[in-house]
């Protein structure tokens, strides 16, 4: 089963989340969390930090990630998606080659599937973050 990760990154004041606009399928043109594939034999948390750095230039010195939850999909292309969350410890200039990066207000409707990828999962993730006061 392929392992993937997505990472919810708050800015230092936790009023914005780092989102990318997908440039390719799946979800081309929609907003999504940053993340990617866990390589075979790779430690899961290390994979999250690696993907975060590759896609945003954020390092482990800038943020402490917490493993929040997992989604497991058993049908079709079975995969496990690990969800991490963290707040930047300082302002960081983000940039990446894979997708356009945008700071979105956390009061956005992340369940809006015309704007956000993941069939409502981004909204669900944020609700779990709020319940757990992360």
Mark where each language-model region is:
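Conserved N-terminal beta-strand and adjoining loop/helix that marks the start
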Residues: 1-17
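Active-site-adjacent beta-strand/loop module that shapes the phosphate/pyrophosphate-binding cleft
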Residues: 13, 71-96, 102-109, 117-133
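Short connector loops at helix/strand junctions that flank enzyme active sites
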Residues: 2, 33, 60, 76-81
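A short coil-to-beta-strand element that immediately follows conserved catalytic motifs
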Residues: 59-69
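Structured-RNA-binding interfaces characteristic of tRNA pseudouridine synthases
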Residues: 114
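Conserved Nudix-box catalytic region and its N-terminal flanking loop in Nudix hydrolases
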Residues: 16-54
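Short hydrophobic alpha-helix segments
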Residues: 21, 69-71
């Amino acid at each position: 089963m392929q392992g993937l990760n997505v990472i919810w990154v708050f800015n230092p004041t936790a009023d914005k989340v780092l989102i990318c606009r997908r440039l390719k399928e799946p979800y081309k043109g929609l907003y999504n969390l940053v993340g990617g594939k866990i390589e075979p034999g790779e430690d899961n948390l290390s994979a999250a930090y690696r993907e975060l750095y590759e896609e945003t230039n954020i390092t482990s010195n800038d943020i402490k990630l917490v493993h929040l939850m997992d989604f497991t999909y058993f049908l079709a292309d079975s995969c496990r998606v690990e969800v991490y969350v963290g707040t930047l410890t300082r302002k960081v200039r983000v940039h990446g080659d894979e997708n356009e990066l945008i700071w979105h207000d956390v009061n956005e409707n992340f369940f809006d599937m015309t704007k956000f990828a993941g069939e409502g999962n981004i909204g669900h993730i944020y609700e779990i973050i709020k319940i757990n006061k992360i």
